[in-house]
Amino acid sequence: LPAVLRNGLSDINVWLWQILQAEVSGEAVPAQSLCGMNAEAIRLVSHDPMKYLGQGHIVPDVALGPNVALLNWLRAQAREVEVAYVQVGMEREDILASLNRLSSAIYVLMLLTVVAESGRDISKVGL
């Protein structure tokens, strides 16, 4: 696995544990990050990946490889959790916002994986 994918998955794991801890403890969800990017950076990259990564938006395709396919599945699952959270009437805005950002973060990780797996130097991206 590319290092960016390993590190990103570790960050996603922490993100999920922080949501769980906030739900159980009643405390606020702490600021979360992905590969050193805060929520605003994740938003910027997810909205304009060409500007920040030199990579346009992607549509999941078998040609992108199994890592991106699995990340897309994970992103779909994150969206399902977000929808279910609303449908069951949960009202914690911080958790809902975190779940929403999670799917964006996974999309950014998909983009980073495409960049890394194409042999481009991920350390040179404009973040």
Regions found by a protein language model. Give the residues of each.
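Phosphate/pyrophosphate-binding loop motifs in nucleotide- or prenyl diphosphate-using proteins
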Residues: 1-127
